[in-house]
């Protein structure tokens, strides 16, 4: 956990694509974070597909690192695309790996969710799906504000900068609310 003033957030992006709108949205969140908040990014793209036979032999090193990162963070930020009305396979795989006993590190963590998609819904269904997982794993998802970046191809420039001022304000508000939520539920 971070010091008494700041909140440490572990972020994970459910998209592996180099030019991903979700990766760009995560960069925007890092840029807009409140003073004193730190946001570290977990690398979840190298995990093998979850297999209990593998886990029974011990967590793979990148998964063990991820579990330690989750445990050390005050709060979590999920940034997810929407694939077939759900979160991405890479994000679900990371959650599946990290949630296994012993010492499931998600329990009690405050979490914020945001996402971007080319569709009008802006990842609303994926975020709902992810929220259900969060509740099952005893995380505490932040309810408001919601950040659904729809029609994302019109809101990022060629360099990947998020140009939508309303959306930038929502991301900023989400992070401020996450900081307040983390303090309110006693994680900080």
Segments from the language model and where they lie:
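Short hydrophobic segments within beta-strands
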Residues: 12-13, 42, 114
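N-terminal beta-loop-helix "entrance" segment that forms/cooperates
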Residues: 44-60, 156
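Short connector loops at secondary-structure junctions
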Residues: 40-49, 147-153
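A generic structural motif
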Residues: 34-40, 139
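Helix-loop-strand module that forms the ligand-binding subsite of alpha/beta enzymes
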Residues: 58-138
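N-terminal beta1-alpha1 ligand-phosphate binding loop
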Residues: 3-36
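Glycine-rich phosphate/pyrophosphate-binding loop and the adjoining helix
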Residues: 2-10, 140-188
């Amino acid at each position: 956990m971070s010091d008494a003033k700041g909140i440490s957030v572990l972020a994970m992006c459910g998209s592996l694509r180099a030019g991903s709108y979700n990766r760009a949205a995560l960069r925007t969140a890092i840029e807009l974070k409140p003073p004193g908040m730190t946001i570290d990014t977990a690398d979840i793209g190298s995990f093998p597909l979850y297999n209990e036979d593998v886990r029974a032999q011990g967590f793979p090193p990148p998964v063990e690192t991820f579990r330690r990162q989750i445990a050390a963070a005050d709060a979590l930020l999920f940034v997810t695309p929407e694939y077939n009305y759900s979160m991405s396979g890479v994000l679900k795989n990371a959650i599946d790996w990290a949630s296994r006993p012993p010492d499931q590190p998600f329990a009690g963590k405050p979490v914020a969710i945001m996402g971007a998609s080319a569709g009008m819904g802006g990842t609303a269904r994926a975020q709902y799906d992810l929220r259900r997982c969060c509740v099952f794993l005893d995380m505490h998802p932040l309810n408001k504000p919601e950040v659904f970046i729809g029609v994302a191809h019109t809101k990022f420039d060629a360099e990947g900068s998020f140009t939508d001022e309303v959306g930038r304000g929502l991301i900023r508000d989400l992070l401020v609310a996450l900081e307040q939520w983390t303090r309110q539920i006693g994680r900080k």
